[in-house]
């Protein structure tokens, strides 16, 4: 079973890693940690009871050096399938992979944006970010619209490879009075 561990850094040295207690559940896996842009929440993936099924994305409040208040993100993010690999853009957009939402096949990358109603709204960025294979582990280079992701696309053996991408800048020109 996977665990999330924490370690303190002093200059160039890391201290001893210790398991982060998210729950007293010792049978479930806890993996793929991502800290929210405001630093108040740790998002993670788990198969612990109370989810929608498979692997779900959960979050727990970070309070000093401890945690408290575990929450399942629920719908529309979690499904009876697997949701994995959460990561954030600085603007708060949550990127994750799922095989439970309609997509191009296998795990697809999705974007969850918080709308004016304070609820998540999902977007599927389509091809070429997603493919018929498993596409996951999307990460960005800081605030730039470029980054990396993993995929087993175009590999008859099913091996994962790392791909780079750059999202095109969308410019809209409005003319009128």
Task: Spell out what each predicted region is.
Residues 1-177:
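Short, conserved micro-motifs composed of acidic
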């Amino acid at each position: 079973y996977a665990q999330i561990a924490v370690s303190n850094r002093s200059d160039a040295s890391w201290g001893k890693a210790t398991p982060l207690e998210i729950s007293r559940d010792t049978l479930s896996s806890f993996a793929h940690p991502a800290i929210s842009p405001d630093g108040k929440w740790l998002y993670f993936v788990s198969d612990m009871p109370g989810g929608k099924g498979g692997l779900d994305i959960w979050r727990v409040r970070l309070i000093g050096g401890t945690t408290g208040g575990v929450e399942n993100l629920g719908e529309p993010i979690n499904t009876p399938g697997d949701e994995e690999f959460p990561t954030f853009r600085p603007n708060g957009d949550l990127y994750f992979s799922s095989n439970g939402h309609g997509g191009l096949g296998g795990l697809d990358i999705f974007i969850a944006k918080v709308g004016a109603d304070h609820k998540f709204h999902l977007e599927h960025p389509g091809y070429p970010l997603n493919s018929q294979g498993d596409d996951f582990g999307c990460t960005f280079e800081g605030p730039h619209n470029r980054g990396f992701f993993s995929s087993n696309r175009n590999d008859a053996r099913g091996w994962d490879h790392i791909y780079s991408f750059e999202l095109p800048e969308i410019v809209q020109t409005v003319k009128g009075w």
